[in-house]
Swiss-Prot record:
Principal location class: secreted
Official protein name in the record: Icarapin
Alphabetized UniProt keyword annotations: Allergen, Glycoprotein, Secreted, Signal
Species this chain originates from: Apis mellifera carnica (Carniolan honeybee)
Tissues/organs with expression: Expressed by the venom duct.
Keyword Glycoprotein included in the entry's annotation: yes
């Protein structure tokens, strides 16, 4: 340990002695006057690096397109993925731009009044009526189709009304004084006759028979 201490002190003295300026001769001064002065300026990145070592570090992780300034962010985060990220970002931006152009082209072909003109019902109409008997009911299907338009766009409105009625029915119409008609539908039965028969025994005889205790029934007790 003593040897190391002595060596350290000796090295320190040598360094201090070497750091002090020495005496300059007059000849050396004259030679230096004849030599042209060359000014060497440090690069911008070196200045930024030296300034960043003494300034407060920037903790922002946002990417800037102005320039690649050196800061603590570039020191802590490697830049080997920046090229891949910029390529992916540019590809996504180009794809979104293409989609916007396609949507703008599609929307530009739609007329100002819209695809369907709701203020006007098409004049041309095709009406069909179909009647079927299903499970004892008469089913009538009335379908009306309105079509209008051109080769670019067209309007189609289809109205279907389904009417279901019993197969056998009677319609009675009553017209009131106010010219309003009320329709009353009463179902009728065809081919069925209801007949009532009177029982040969009266109610009193049936009740007496129900309350009578049979003589033949009884409990048999055996010892």
């Amino acid at each position: 340990m003593k040897t190391l201490g002595v060596l350290f002190i000796a090295a320190w003295f040598i360094a201090c002695t070497h750091s002090f300026p020495g005496a300059h001769d007059e000849d050396s001064k004259e030679e230096r006057k004849n030599v042209d002065t060359v000014l060497v300026l440090p690069s911008i990145e070196r200045d930024q690096m030296m300034a960043a070592t003494f300034d407060f570090p920037s903790l922002s992780f946002e990417d800037s397109d102005e320039g690649s300034n050196w800061n603590w962010n570039t020191l802590l985060r490697p830049n080997f993925l920046d090229g891949w990220y910029q390529t992916l970002q540019s590809a996504i931006s180009a794809h979104m731009k293409k989609v916007r152009e396609q949507m703008a082209g599609i929307l530009s072909r739609i007329p100002e009044q819209g695809v369907v003109n709701w203020n006007k019902i098409p004049e041309g109409a095709n009406t069909t009526s179909t009647t079927k008997i299903i499970d004892g009911h008469v089913v009538t299907i009335n379908e009306t189709t309105y079509t209008d338009g051109s080769d670019d766009y067209s309007t189609l409105i289809r109205v279907r009304v389904i009417d279901v009625r019993p197969q056998n029915e009677t319609i009675l119409t009553t017209v009131s004084s106010e010219a309003d008609s009320d329709v009353t539908t009463l179902p009728t039965l065809i081919g069925k006759n209801e007949t009532s028969t009177q029982s040969s025994r009266s109610v009193e005889s049936v009740e007496d028979f129900d309350n009578e205790i049979p003589k033949n029934q009884g409990d048999v007790l055996t010892a």
